[in-house]
Regions:
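C-terminal and inter-domain tail/linker signature
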Residues: 1-330
Length: 330
């Protein structure tokens, strides 16, 4: 199946949106009147063009001047979780919004230096219009680059997420359907093994079923990146599972793949109860929501790389810590 028209529509949308002082006009040209936009805290859900322009895109472009969109991954496909007869296609984009951090943004003090805001976006296309967007972004990464990291030391390494090994993530041309099917099968197998953390297998053995030994896990600020199954188990997956109980089943809005790339997002993806230890925080009886985007690169029949976006500010706010409000006092 060919998704070239939908890809071109999103590329045209980006070209219009990324121009200075053209936010509402660009949004109105490409978004359907009844669109839904989802973004991380403090933006959450937006369904009004003027609000989306004035609260999200105008402030971003005011704060990050000379803005450039630097994409590392770009692909499209049908949502595997819905009936193919719904007529919609999803386009996925991941990379960084790069600019000069010249004005404050959400209380983050500017540096007047180059900065890169990691983002990932799922866009649903129906009838030549964008009807739904999930725009997830690593706002704590912007804080860290500005010397205002609000988190305690993290278990993984802090860095700007790179694109995929081999730099082949921009799928601007059509790809064989069987490659996307193989990628989706690998992702589904990983999700099935993950389950509710009750596989009964030792963690590293469980991971080795669907991951290459030299896997790369590009985690968000607050958790960090890890390399190899052994270090991923020790530096993220093991500590994370130990810090939570009563994990709900996975709940995705969209899951798709094209070529060697695929991914999913939820709102939320799952809930779990924090028993203590995550990011050095004490436990609580609250069931926490996790809003997540995961993108993957497949090699052979296993997964090789994973880019993860988690709404860390929303997770902490559910535990009584408003990071943005606290930032204003520092």
């Amino acid at each position: 199946m060919d998704f070239q028209a939908e890809k071109q529509l999103v590329l045209d949308f980006y070209a219009a949106l990324d121009r200075p002082q053209a936010s509402e006009a660009a949004l109105g040209q490409y978004l359907a009147p009844d669109f839904t936009w989802r973004g991380y805290h403090p933006f959450n859900e937006i369904r009004d063009l003027g609000q989306l322009a004035s609260t999200v895109w105008d402030p971003i472009k005011t704060s990050l001047t000379s803005l450039q969109r630097r994409m590392d991954i770009f692909f499209a496909g049908r949502n595997s979780l819905t009936d193919s007869a719904d007529g919609s296609t999803w386009v996925v984009s991941m990379g960084h919004l790069m600019g000069l951090f010249d004005q404050p943004f959400l209380g983050i003090r500017p540096t007047r230096r180059i900065t890169m805001l990691p983002y990932c976006e799922f866009l649903r296309i129906e009838g030549g219009r964008i009807t739904e967007i999930a725009f997830y972004f690593d706002l704590p990464s912007l804080m860290d680059q500005a010397g205002q990291n609000p988190f305690p030391p993290q278990t993984g390494a802090q860095m700007i997420q790179p694109g995929p090994q081999g730099q082949g993530g921009l799928l601007l041309d059509s790809n064989p359907a069987e490659e996307g099917e193989a990628t989706l099968a690998a992702i589904n197998a990983m999700i099935a093994d993950l389950g509710q953390w009750q596989s009964g297998l030792p963690l590293e053995e469980e991971l080795a079923r669907t991951w290459h030994d030299d896997m790369l896990w590009w985690g968000p600020t607050g958790i960090g990146a890890t390399f190899t199954i052994e270090r991923y188990a020790k530096q993220h997956s093991g500590p994370f599972r130990a810090a939570f109980a009563d994990r709900a089943k996975t709940n995705h809005i969209c899951r798709l793949a094209e070529g060697h790339f695929g991914g999913f997002f939820g709102w939320p993806n799952f809930t779990a109860r924090h028993v203590g230890g995550f990011m050095g925080l004490p436990g609580s009886d609250t069931m926490l929501e996790f809003r997540v985007i995961d993108l993957y690169r497949r090699e052979g029949d296993k997964l090789a790389e994973n880019w993860i976006f988690i709404d860390m500010l929303h997770v902490l706010k559910q535990q009584g810590m408003d990071v943005l409000a606290r930032l204003e006092t520092l």
